[in-house]
Amino acid sequence: MTLDPITCPDGMQQTLGALLYEGLLVLDESFAPQNVLCSRYEHNDDCTSYTFYLRDGVSFSDGSILTASDVLATLRRAQESERYSARFANVASMRASNGALIVNLTRADSAFPALFDIPIVKSGSEKNTVPLGTGPYLFVTDSDGACLKQNPDWHSDGTLPFERIELRAVKDADTASYLFSSREVHLLSADLTSSTGDLRSADTALTDYATANMIYLGFNTQRAPLSDASLRSALAGAIDRATITTGYLAGHAEAAHFPLSPHSSLYPTEMASTLASPDLAAALESAGVTESRPRTVTILVSESDSFKVSIADYLSRTLSTDVLTVSVRSLPWNDYLTALQNGNFDLYLGEVRLTANWDISSLARTGGTLNYGRYADEQCNTLLDAFSLNETDQTARALYRYLAQSAPIAPIAFKTASVLTPSGLIDGLNPTVSSPFYGIEGWTVHFDKG
């Protein structure tokens, strides 16, 4: 199975690839981009054109020098890939020029560099089972089997904690989990809200890290009574996010009132604690839902995710009132998606992997590709544009305050992922959404604990 970071499956291959490949940038704990293969970048006044200058002296694991053409070739493949294509929705053109990559956008995006933590491989090697990368380790097969060894051409001056990393071939995530439990594997990266078993134990260290995966409740804004913005806002405010994150997502999520990670420096924490939602009873009456005219609305959810089905059931119980009954309809994934695309729903429980520039145009802009609720609001479009042009605390607060009031969606939580190791084995573990091995040069390994 290929280790090409553009086309490999999600999961174990990506974890391994984080040691073999690097991007122009990497995202830190707050989703801020840090330079890796580029030394610096600049943009024009309206943030519609970016130039990324490559770092000098970077070579692939075969000793060949990294070029802008290599970067361009990988990004062109990423543009057509299922995993990364959404990041290029705003890209008009890309070209390599004199050791730099020039990217032109269709509209302003002051946070565009946060999208370029895409792993780069040497052009022409992408069809290899293990394409060539610039990362701290390289893949080798010797008399003892497949392993990773330190890349002697790695560009960093940092000291790596392992000379050799043994690899074990596994057929699926369950097998990997078993091997970790039996300590035949010493590091595992996992989404524990999707795990079939509990990998936690007294001798296991678990380090969670923030992701951009948002769980949210979507509203059909074209169908009464949810066409009423005050009612949508009241329902959003009535969601007990703390109970959902701790009780239904096993603690591997963080409550969020706005569509960006609470770890982002732009997250308006103070506004989240002071924002007042409309009174639900008053909002129902204003929307025409009364004792004489009770209503039933239904939450659509995919039956393939037991965590989300449980959350939907909880929402149905806690959002129902004497005059509003909230029911749940679970559907197979394809039927669920078809119903969303056809607008055949009242509410739906969804999950989306946002990009780290926190552009939610697909969800909230008129005609957005994921705007299943047919929300259309010119003021929201204007605020989205202002935020994209200049991501500041001021533009963020203006946008998120308006979204809380008009409530096309109700953010619930951002999931966390987990890195599991034997207790006491590694000090300094600091995984991020870009890499579970972020800052590996700073690790201290206690080999007697393995």
What are these regions (language model features)?
Residues 1-45, 76, 132:
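N-terminal lobe/hinge region of extracytoplasmic solute-binding protein
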Residues 104-166, 172-174:
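Gly/Pro-rich hinge or "lid" segments in bacterial periplasmic/extracellular proteins
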Residues 140-147, 166-223, 351:
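Extracellular/periplasmic solute-recognition and catalytic clefts
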Residues 222-264, 400-408:
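Periplasmic-binding protein-like
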Residues 237, 253-287, 305-308:
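Structural transition elements
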Residues 287-354:
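Ligand/substrate-recognition segments at binding pockets and active sites
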Residues 327-336, 361-425, 449-450:
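Extracytoplasmic/peripheral linker and loop segments enriched in polar/acidic and small residues
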Residues 422-450:
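Long beta-strand-rich cores associated with HINT superfamily self-processing modules
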